[in-house]
């Protein structure tokens, strides 16, 4: 637990998480000092496109007591064993753990990973986590760092599918493929081989909130590739996250689909903050952008694949209530005419960007103790 990556994770998470905030997700549950007796209340607190995510609510509590990993025949008490069961489970941890997976871990539907009350690290030079062809998964309170590429090997996908060969993977920290109703909240992501969060292959109904992203170049990819137009159905909410320090680009980088980027705090980037190709709809609202010092890096946005300056002028990229520092600026285009993007259940109040540092100051893994509010 004394590697430079782990020390950095602890330092940044302490600095970001030292005070209480009142964004609508946190105010739903964080004031309750008895949260540990009512863990599943968390499932009622999501907002945005992933607000219907149930995770393991209504299922049994499953406690991880063993940090070991067997990709094919996981032992009871290990994380992979709980993740691959074919029933709803709310997965908690008996204490602090550093879990180095031997192969990518696939999560079955209707699961919650709830790291509150422990410091749970996944990565450490091993492959990380996949959510593929399932629905209703909540990932909360984990450190995902140092995720690496994997080799060809057999993996237990879940109880129904059994063991299947899994091809080498790129080393993303968290990958969503053809996944629906997913909520990723209050995690700390850094230092992985490829991306930190990838949402692809018609994944939709996703909320990514209250996370800390730092020390990484390619942060978040939404949309598989420019040839995969089925991602037009993708809807993702990116809200109350802290991007930085030391993030390069893709916060997010979108293809097709609809992305609402709301009340996120951006430290200076090295390439760009928000980008995309293949005509995604990007609605930026109430964010705080601080540009790097270099004069040629002030633009928040980058449009990729435009053959001429006018060929992307009809893309709907809108900025409302954003605030800009150190010369940052957002290039808007198009006009959104789709009406309300959210149902009544999904909708949440978005503050002016001036309030965003307060709303995001607890982004990342929280420090939660029994009988005390997080």
Swiss-Prot record:
Signal peptide: 1-21
PTM comment text: N-glycosylated; contains fucose and xylose.
Positions that bind Ca(2+): 170, 194, 198
SUPFAM superfamilies linked: Pectin lyase-like
Reported cofactor(s): Ca(2+)
Disulfide bridge partners, by residue number: 28-45, 128-147, 306-312
Family: Belongs to the polysaccharide lyase 1 family. Amb a subfamily.
Protein name: Pectate lyase 1
Taxonomic source organism: Cryptomeria japonica
């Amino acid at each position: 637990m004394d590697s430079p990556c782990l020390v950095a994770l602890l330092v940044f998470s302490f600095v970001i998480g030292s005070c209480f905030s009142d964004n609508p997700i946190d105010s739903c549950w964080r004031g309750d000092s008895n949260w540990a007796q009512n863990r599943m209340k968390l499932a009622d607190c999501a907002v945005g496109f992933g607000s219907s995510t149930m995770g393991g609510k209504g299922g049994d509590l499953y406690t991880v007591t063993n940090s070991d990993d067997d990709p094919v025949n996981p032992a009871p008490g290990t994380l992979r064993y709980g993740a691959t069961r074919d029933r709803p489970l709310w997965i908690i941890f008996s204490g602090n753990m550093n879990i180095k997976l031997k192969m990518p871990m696939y999560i079955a539907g209707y699961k919650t990973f709830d790291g509150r009350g422990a410091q749970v690290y996944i990565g450490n030079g091993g492959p990380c986590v996949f959510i593929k062809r399932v629905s209703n998964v909540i990932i909360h309170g984990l450190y995902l760092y140092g995720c690496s590429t994997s080799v060809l090997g057999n993996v237990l996908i879940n109880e129904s599918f059994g063991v299947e060969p899994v091809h080498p993977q790129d080393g993303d920290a968290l990958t969503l493929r053809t996944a629906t109703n997913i909520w990723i909240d209050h995690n700390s992501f850094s230092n992985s081989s490829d991306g930190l969060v990838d949402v692809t292959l018609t994944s939709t109904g996703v909320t990514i909130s209250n996370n800390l992203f730092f020390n990484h170049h390619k942060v978040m990819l939404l949309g598989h590739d420019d040839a995969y137009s089925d991602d037009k159905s993708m809807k993702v909410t990116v809200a109350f996250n802290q991007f930085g320090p030391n993030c390069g680009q893709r916060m997010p980088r979108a293809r097709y689909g609809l992305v609402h980027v709301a009340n996120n705090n951006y430290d200076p980037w090295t390439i760009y903050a928000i980008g995309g190709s293949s005509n995604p709809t990007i609605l930026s609202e109430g964010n705080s952008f601080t540009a790097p010092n270099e004069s040629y890096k002030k633009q928040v946005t980058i449009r990729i694949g435009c053959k001429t300056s006018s060929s992307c002028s009809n893309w709907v990229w809108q900025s409302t209530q954003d605030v800009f520092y150190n010369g940052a600026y957002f290039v808007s285009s198009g006009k959104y005419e789709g009406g309300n993007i959210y149902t009544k259940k999904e909708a949440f109040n978005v503050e002016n960007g001036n309030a965003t540092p307060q709303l995001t100051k607890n982004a990342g893994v929280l420090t939660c103790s029994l009988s005390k509010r997080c």
